[in-house]
Swiss-Prot record:
<feature type="active site" description="Nucleophile">
    <location>
        <position position="961"/>
    </location>
</feature>
<comment type="function">
    <text>Degrades oligopeptides in a sequential manner.</text>
</comment>
<dbReference type="Pfam" id="PF14685">
    <property type="entry name" value="PDZ_Tricorn"/>
</dbReference>
<feature type="site" description="Transition state stabilizer; via amide nitrogen">
    <location>
        <position position="962"/>
    </location>
</feature>
<dbReference type="InterPro" id="IPR005151">
    <property type="entry name" value="Tail-specific_protease"/>
</dbReference>
<dbReference type="InterPro" id="IPR036034">
    <property type="entry name" value="PDZ_sf"/>
</dbReference>
<feature type="binding site">
    <location>
        <position position="914"/>
    </location>
    <ligand>
        <name>substrate</name>
    </ligand>
</feature>
<dbReference type="Pfam" id="PF14684">
    <property type="entry name" value="Tricorn_C1"/>
</dbReference>
<dbReference type="InterPro" id="IPR011659">
    <property type="entry name" value="PD40"/>
</dbReference>
<keyword id="KW-0645">Protease</keyword>
<feature type="active site" description="Charge relay system">
    <location>
        <position position="1019"/>
    </location>
</feature>
<feature type="region of interest" description="Disordered">
    <location>
        <begin position="518"/>
        <end position="551"/>
    </location>
</feature>
<dbReference type="InterPro" id="IPR029045">
    <property type="entry name" value="ClpP/crotonase-like_dom_sf"/>
</dbReference>
<dbReference type="InterPro" id="IPR015943">
    <property type="entry name" value="WD40/YVTN_repeat-like_dom_sf"/>
</dbReference>
<keyword id="KW-0720">Serine protease</keyword>
<keyword id="KW-0963">Cytoplasm</keyword>
<dbReference type="InterPro" id="IPR028204">
    <property type="entry name" value="Tricorn_C1"/>
</dbReference>
C-alpha cells in the first residue's frame, strides 16, 4: 500500500465493486470505472462532497450521500447515465448510504427523528421516495447482511484512520445474530482494535481493524474462528472496504486496491484514470472583503497595508490604486504592520516563505521589478502570534507561541529575547512614542495577567502591575506620560436569578498609570483648571518632535487610577490623539436565549473614546468588529459590517458616506489570486508546523512527526478538492493517535436552502394520507425547542393529515418532505384534513431547520417520567447533554425539583464534553449539614440544592471529553457509583485558536489531563463504570433501557440502607 505514481493522479475514496464496475468518489463527485482499471466517467456532476456510493444488487443503479442541498441526503441515479433522484428529505447532518437490501432498497444510516446526533439508526429506502422502514437494531455504524445479520456499533462519527490506534469506549464492535432471532451477541470481543466496514464474502465476515497497529482487512468465520489478515500493516491504513460478495475493494492514501478473493489473493492497485477539467484546481480571484484578515493604517491614514487570503497589499483609502506587496502563491503572509522611517511609509509582516515564520519588510510604494522583500529572523521566532513596530522603525516586537517576547532589530536582523513565560503567550505588545520602552500583557496562572515594561536598550524588565488580576491591552498615551490598560479588577457581584449564587458579570474597567512620579492623574484636580473645548483636531498640528517617555519604576503600582467610567466588558484599548479608544461589548447570554427573538442579531459592540482633556466618553460608532489607529492618532481604521472604513478618532463619523469623516475603503481594487494546489501545499505544511509547536508532548509521544509529513506529502499531489485536503489532514493528524485533533472546513457547500422540519412524527397510512402520529411538545424555556405544530392557532393534532404545503398537494408517495425544502425559518401554509373528518383547515407554521433540541427535551421528559414511575416518585432525574452553556442551562431547568427527591439519577450518557464538569461536580458533591425551617413555609436544606440521598451516574460510550472527566470525578470524590459502559476516552484538550489561510479550523491536542485514580490513563481508554451494563441492539429494538434500570435499582437499594435526609421537627 505504498504510494506509486498513477497515470492520472487522483484522490480516490469510498469504492464499491459490482461485476465489472467499481463506483467511487473523486473530485467531489461519484464516478464509475472498469474494475480492472482504465478511464472513469462521472455519475454525478454537482461538485460537492459526496460519499459511500453503492451499486444496486442488479447493477442498474448507484446510490450515494450528497451534500448538494446542504445537509447530506440520499441520492440515486442509473448506472447507464441520467439525472439523479433525491430520496430523502431528512435534514439531518448525520445521514449516510451504506448499501442495499436484498430486495432492492437503499440501506442508509441517519439520526433523523432522533433526540441525539449519536443515534444513527439504519433505514431501508424504497426507490420511489416513499417512507423508509426503520430497522430494529438501534444505533449502529454499519449493517452487514448475509448468512446472518452483523452490526457495527455506532461510532462517535469519525473514521479509524482519523484517530489511529483508538481504543476508547466507541471503538468499533461487532454484533452478530447467529440464530436469526433478533438476539445479538458480540463477535471478536477479544480483539483489541477499532473495527469498521464489516461485510460478508461467502461464509466469511470481513472487516477493517487496526489491532495490529495499522488498519488492515481481516476476515473470519461467523463464530469468530479462522481469523486471517489479507492486507499488509506496514503502510497506510486500509479504508472504506466494500465487496460485491466475492471481490473486495478498499482505499488507501487516495488509491484503490482490490482483492480477487479472501483465499490468498494479494492486493493489487487499480489503475484508474479520470478525465475532465478538474475545476477545483484552477486558479481563481478572491473577494478581498470576504477574505479580509487584518489591516494597518499609515501615519496619516491615507493608506493601509491589508492582509487578504495570504497576501499583503497596499490600499489607498480615497481613490488611487492598490498594489501587491506579497502575493506569491503558496506562501502565507499575515499580520501586516506599518511604520515610518525618514518620512517614508514601510510595512512589515510575517511570512512562511521559508517554512517557519520570518519577518519581511518592504516600502509601501512597492518593490522594484525583480526585487524581493527583505527577510529577517527566519526560524528564530517560533509561531508569531502578535507583532508591534517601534514608532521610529528601529525594531519589531514579537510575541511567540512558546511564551517568548522578542525584539528584532531592523538594521542588523539581531533577535534579542526580552522575557519568556511558562504560563502562555504574551499579548498587547506596544512601544512608547519615543520607542524606548516596550509594554505587554504577561501571562500568569490562568486567568491572571500582569503588565510588564522593558527598556528597549538594555532589556531590563520591570513589573508595571502586580500579578493579582487580569491586566491586558496596554497603550502608551501619545504624549508618553501615561500607560492606559484594561483590567478585570472590579468586584461587584450580581445575584443569580435561578439559584443561590453570585457572579461577576462585568468586571473590567480601563485604568491608567502615571509613568513619572511627578505627573498628576488626568482625572484629578488640575493646577490651572480644565481647558475649554480644544480646537478642531483636524487643524491641530502634530507637536514638535517626539515626546520623551520617563518612567519611575518605583511606586508604579501605587499610581494606578481607574478611568471614571462604569465597569463593563471591554477589549482592545488603543491610544489616540488627546484620548484613548476601546471596544465596549454588550452583556449577552452565551445561548442567545434572552433575546427578544431568537433570530435577532447580537447587540452591537460600541467603539468608544475617552477624551482625556474634556474628561468624557464619546461614542464613535456601533457594530465595531475591529479597529486600528493611524500613527498620528487622528483617524481610525474600522472594520464594521463587512466593510473597511476610515473615521475620525475624536468624534462620531458623519452620516454622509464617503465624506472626509466617513470613508469606505474600496477593497475591490485588491487583486489576490488563489492557486489551489499551491495553497493546499502551504496549508499542509502549516498544519504540520502548528501541530509540532503545540502538541502536548514535545517528543510527539514517540511519533516521528517529520517522517509522517514526509510520508503523506506525496499524497498531496492527488488532492483535487478542498474536501480531499480535509480528509488528508484528518488522516495525518490521526497518526498521533490522540483525541481532539480536528480539521473543520469553513463550510459553504450546498444551496443553503435548509430542509424545513415540522417537529412531529408523520407516516403514510393505508388510505394514502400522510398523517401526524405525534406532535412534539414545546419546551418553553428553550427558544430552540419550539414546536411548529403546537404553536397557538395551529391546532394540528395526532391523526390529522397534511394534504397540501404552500398550496401544492402532498404526493401520496413522497409525502410533504419535498415541499418543505428551503422552508426552514420561513412561514409556510399547511392544508390540514382533521382526523375526524370535516372541512380542511389552513394553518401557517414556521418549520425548523433542526429538530434535535425539540426531540431532546421530549426524550428527557420521557426518561424523567420513567424514573419517577419506576421509583414511586422517590428518585429525581437530571440529564446533562454537554459540559457547556447548553448543559449548564439544562441542569438548572429542573435542579430544584429533582434534587429535592430522596435520591438522584444523573444521566451523562451522550455528554458531548466542554469545560463545565467541575461546576457540575460541585453541585453534585454538596452534602446537607443543616435545615432552614421558616414559619409557614417548607424547610430548605443547607446548603441549598444538595442531594438528600444517594446519587447514581449513568454513562455510556458517547460520554466524552469533559464527559469522560465528570465520570472520573464522580468516582474520585465518592459522589456515587457510575453505571453503564466505558466512556469515549478523549481528555487531551484544545483551544481552537488556529485557522488556516482559507478559514479551515485545525486543532492541536495541547492540554494533557491527569485524574485521580486514573493518572494519565483516561486518554484513549475512557472511564470504566463501577457497574457495567451494556445496551445491546435488542434492547434498543425493544425500547428497553437496562442502564437506567440498573441505576434506579442501585439508588433504591442505597435508600433502603441509608434513608434520605429529612428536616427535623421543631423543638
Amino acid at each position: 500500500m505504498g504510494v506509486t505514481q498513477p497515470a492520472a493522479p487522483a484522490y480516490l475514496r469510498f469504492p464499491h465493486p459490482h461485476g465489472e464496475l467499481v463506483a467511487f468518489t473523486a473530485e467531489d463527485d461519484v464516478w464509475l470505472a472498469p474494475l480492472d482499471g482504465g478511464r472513469a466517467w462521472r455519475v454525478s456532476a454537482d461538485n460537492v462532497p459526496v460519499n459511500h456510493p453503492r451499486i444496486s444488487p442488479d447493477g442498474t443503479k448507484v446510490a450515494w450521500t450528497s451534500t448538494r442541498d446542504g445537509a447530506p441526503e440520499v441520492h440515486v441515479a442509473p448506472v447507464e447515465g441520467g439525472p439523479a433522484k433525491r430520496l430523502t428529505h431528512w435534514g439531518s447532518i448525520r445521514t449516510q448510504v451504506r448499501g442495499w437490501t436484498a430486495d432492492g432498497r437503499v440501506l442508509a444510516l441517519s439520526t433523523y427523528g432522533q433526540a441525539s446526533l449519536r443515534r444513527s439508526w439504519a433505514r431501508a429506502l424504497p426507490l420511489d421516495g416513499g417512507p423508509a422502514t426503520t430497522l430494529p437494531y438501534g444505533p449502529v455504524g454499519d449493517v452487514a447482511q448475509g448468512p446472518h445479520t452483523v452490526l457495527l456499533s455506532a461510532p462517535m462519527g469519525r473514521e479509524a484512520a482519523w484517530w489511529k490506534r483508538y481504543r476508547g469506549g466507541t471503538a468499533g464492535k461487532l454484533w452478530i445474530d447467529r440464530e436469526d432471532d433478533g438476539e445479538f451477541v458480540r463477535l471478536h470481543d477479544g480483539l483489541d482494535g477499532n473495527i469498521e466496514y464489516p461485510f460478508w464474502v461467502g461464509d466469511r465476515i470481513a472487516f477493517l481493524s487496526d489491532h495490529e497497529g495499522t488498519g488492515a482487512l481481516y476476515s473470519s468465520l461467523a463464530d469468530g474462528s479462522d481469523l486471517r489478515r489479507h492486507t499488509p500493516v506496514d503502510g497506510f491504513y486500509a479504508r472504506h472496504a466494500a465487496t460485491d460478495g466475492s471481490r473486495v475493494v478498499y482505499a488507501s492514501a487516495g488509491e484503490l486496491w482490490t482483492l480477487d478473493d479472501l483465499d490468498g489473493a494479494e492486493p493489487r492497485r487499480l489503475d484508474i484514470r479520470l478525465g475532465g477539467a478538474r475545476v477545483d484546481l484552477q486558479s481563481y480571484p478572491v473577494n478581498a472583503a470576504r477574505w479580509f484578515g487584518s489591516a494597518s493604517p499609515d501615519h496619516t491614514a491615507r493608506g493601509s497595508a491589508v492582509a487578504v487570503r495570504g497576501g499583503v497589499h497596499w490600499v489607498t483609502h480615497r481613490s488611487g490604486p492598490a498594489r501587491a506587496l506579497a502575493a506569491t502563491p503558496g506562501v502565507r503572509n499575515r499580520l501586516p504592520r506599518t511604520f515610518r522611517v525618514d518620512g517614508e511609509e514601510w510595512v512589515v509582516w510575517v511570512t512562511d516563505a521559508e517554512g517557519d515564520d520570518a519577518l519581511e519588510f518592504a516600502p509601501a510604494t512597492g518593490l522594484a521589478p525583480g526585487a524581493t522583500a527583505r527577510r529577517l529572523a527566519a526560524g528564530q521566532l517560533g509561531r508569531v502570534l502578535h507583532l508591534a513596530v517601534a514608532p521610529d522603525g528601529s525594531r519589531v516586537a514579537v510575541a511567540s507561541h512558546d511564551g517568548r517576547v522578542l525584539l528584532v532589530e531592523r538594521e542588523s536582523g539581531e533577535v534579542r529575547e526580552v522575557d519568556r513565560s511558562e504560563d502562555g503567550d504574551a499579548s498587547g505588545l506596544v512601544f512608547s512614542p519615543d520607542s524606548s520602552w516596550l509594554a505587554w500583557s504577561h501571562p500568569g496562572p490562568e486567568p491572571l495577567r500582569q503588565l510588564k515594561l522593558a527598556n528597549t536598550t538594555d532589556l531590563s524588565v520591570s513589573e508595571a502591575t502586580p500579578l493579582r488580576f487580569k491586566d491586558y491591552s496596554p497603550a502608551f498615551t501619545l504624549d508618553g506620560k501615561h500607560l492606559a490598560f484594561l483590567s478585570t479588577r472590579s468586584f461587584d457581584p450580581v445575584y443569580d436569578e435561578h439559584v443561590f449564587d453570585l457572579a461577576f458579570v462585568e468586571g473590567a474597567r480601563p485604568y491608567l498609570i502615571t509613568l513619572a512620579a511627578t505627573t498628576p492623574s488626568p482625572f484629578g484636580p488640575q493646577r490651572h483648571g480644565r481647558p475649554f473645548e480644544t480646537p478642531d483636531r483636524e487643524e491641530t498640528p502634530d507637536s514638535e518632535g517626539t515626546p520623551t517617555t520617563r518612567i519611575d519604576i518605583e511606586g508604579l503600582a501605587d499610581r494606578i487610577v481607574p478611568f471614571p467610567v462604569e465597569a463593563a466588558r471591554y477589549s482592545r484599548l488603543r491610544a489616540a490623539k488627546d484620548g484613548v479608544l476601546w471596544l465596549r461589548h454588550p452583556l449577552t447570554g452565551v445561548l442567545g436565549a434572552s433575546r427578544a427573538n431568537p433570530e435577532d442579531p447580537d447587540p452591537n459592540t460600541e467603539l468608544e473614546r475617552y477624551d482625556l482633556a474634556q474628561q468624557r466618553v464619546e461614542h464613535l460608532g456601533g457594530d465595531a468588529d475591529h479597529f486600528e489607529v493611524s500613527g498620528d492618532g487622528k483617524r481610525v481604521l474600522l472594520w464594521t459590517d463587512g466593510r473597511l472604513k476610515v473615521v475620525p478618532s475624536d468624534r462620531r463619523a458623519s452620516g454622509d458616506e464617503d465624506s472626509d469623516t466617513n470613508i469606505t475603503v474600496d477593497l475591490g481594487r485588491v487583486r489576490q489570486t488563489v492557486e489551489p494546489a499551491a495553497e493546499w501545499r502551504q496549508m499542509f505544511d502549516e498544519t504540520g508546523r502548528i501541530m509540532r509547536d503545540h502538541y502536548w508532548r514535545a517528543d510527539m509521544n514517540g511519533v516521528d512527526w517529520d517522517g509522517v509529513l514526509d510520508r503523506y506529502r506525496p499524497v498531496l499531489d492527488r488532492v483535487a478538492t478542498h474536501d480531499d485536503l480535509v480528509d488528508l489532514l484528518w488522516e495525518v493528524h490521526g497518526e498521533l493517535g490522540t483525541s481532539h485533533a480536528y480539521v473543520t472546513p469553513r463550510g459553504g457547500h450546498g444551496s443553503g436552502a435548509r430542509q424545513g422540519l415540522l417537529g412531529a412524527d408523520l407516516s403514510r397510512h393505508e388510505d394514502g394520507a400522510w398523517r401526524i402520529d405525534r406532535v412534539l411538545p414545546s419546551e418553553t424555556s428553550d427558544p430552540d425547542a419550539r414546536s411548529p405544530l403546537a404553536a397557538p392557532g395551529v391546532a394540528v393534532r395526532a391523526g390529522d393529515a397534511i394534504v397540501a404545503v404552500a398550496g401544492q398537494a402532498v404526493d401520496p408517495v413522497t409525502g410533504p418532505g419535498p415541499l418543505l425544502v428551503g422552508t426552514a425559518g420561513k412561514p409556510v401554509e399547511l392544508t390540514v384534513s382533521p382526523s375526524g373528518g370535516g372541512e380542511v383547515r389552513h394553518a401557517v407554521v414556521v418549520p425548523l431547520a433542526d429538530e434535535e433540541p425539540l426531540r431532546y427535551h421530549a426524550w428527557v421528559a420521557d426518561r424523567r417520567a420513567y424514573v419517577h414511575e419506576k421509583s414511586g416518585g422517590r428518585l429525581g432525574y437530571l440529564h446533562v447533554p454537554d459540559m457547556q452553556a447548553p448543559g449548564w442551562a439544562q441542569i438548572h431547568r429542573d435542579l430544584r425539583v429533582e434534587v429535592a427527591r430522596e435520591g438522584l439519577v444523573v444521566d451523562v450518557r451522550e455528554n458531548r464534553g466542554g469545560h463545565t464538569s467541575q461546576l457540575v461536580v460541585e453541585k453534585l458533591a454538596r452534602r446537607i449539614v443543616g435545615w432552614d425551617l421558616p414559619r409557614g413555609m417548607r424547610p430548605t436544606s443547607y446548603p441549598q440544592d444538595a442531594p438528600r440521598g444517594p446519587v447514581v451516574a449513568v454513562a455510556n460510550e458517547f460520554s466524552g471529553s469533559d464527559g469522560d472527566i465528570v465520570n472520573a470525578a464522580i468516582k474520585a470524590l465518592g459522589i456515587g457509583p457510575v453505571v453503564g459502559v466505558r466512556t469515549w476516552g478523549g481528555v487531551i484538550g484544545i483551544d481552537s485558536r488556529y485557522r488556516l489561510v482559507d478559514g479551515t479550523l485545525i486543532t492541536q491536542p495541547k492540554y494533557a489531563f491527569w485524574l485521580e485514580g486514573y493518572g494519565w490513563g483516561v486518554e484513549n481508554h475512557g472511564v470504566d463504570p463501577d457497574v457495567e451494563v451494556p445496551q445491546r441492539p435488542q434492547d434498543h429494538a425493544a425500547g428497553r433501557d437496562p442502564q437506567l434500570d440498573e441505576a434506579i435499582a442501585l439508588a433504591l437499594a442505597a435508600l433502603e440502607e441509608t434513608p434520605a435526609k429529612t428536616p427535623p421537627s421543631l423543638p
